[in-house]
């Protein structure tokens, strides 16, 4: 697990922030280590949808399909799109170099 890739985050005002991120970490971990606003209330345990992100189709298609548990949580996400994923479930790999990740302007945290 060595090496870094470029990840560009698009925040709700359209501003882009590009960071170098270590391969093997999740999008959720990268947002937290770079002071970007992505909640992750359940800390990556697939119990909420507050780390919902939107990907470009090119990169969405490079990921493994979401698990049933992730799809169940995505159903609760605010502003769901065809290329929505949970940031805690996207683990960075070399083929994701240059990925663009849109951070939604709002989240929905439903306590179960």
From Swiss-Prot:
Q: Where is the 2Fe-2S ferredoxin-type domain?
A: 5-107
Q: Looking at the keywords, is Ribosomal protein present?
A: no
Q: GO MF annotations for this entry? A: 2 iron, 2 sulfur cluster binding; electron transfer activity; metal ion binding
- InterPro entries of this UniProt entry? 2Fe-2S_ferredoxin-like_sf (IPR036010), 2Fe-2S_ferredoxin-type (IPR001041), Adrenodoxin-like (IPR001055), Adrenodoxin_Fe-S_BS (IPR018298), Beta-grasp_dom_sf (IPR012675)
Q: Does the keyword Metal-binding apply?
A: yes
Could you list this entry's UniProt keywords, alphabetically sorted: 2Fe-2S, Electron transport, Iron, Iron-sulfur, Metal-binding, Transport
Cofactors, names only = [2Fe-2S] cluster
> Its domain of life?
Bacteria
Where, by residue number, does [2Fe-2S] cluster bind? Answer: 42, 48, 51, 88
Q: Which GO terms describe its biological process?
A: P450-containing electron transport chain
Listed as disulfide-bonded, the cysteine pairs are: none
A Pfam family matched by this chain, by name? Fer2
By sequence similarity, the record places it as follows: Belongs to the adrenodoxin/putidaredoxin family.
* Biological function: Ferredoxin are iron-sulfur proteins that transfer electrons in a wide variety of metabolic reactions.
Mind telling me what this protein is named? 2Fe-2S ferredoxin
Taxonomy, top ranks, is: Bacteria, Pseudomonadati, Pseudomonadota, Alphaproteobacteria, Rickettsiales
Q: Which gene encodes it?
A: fdxB
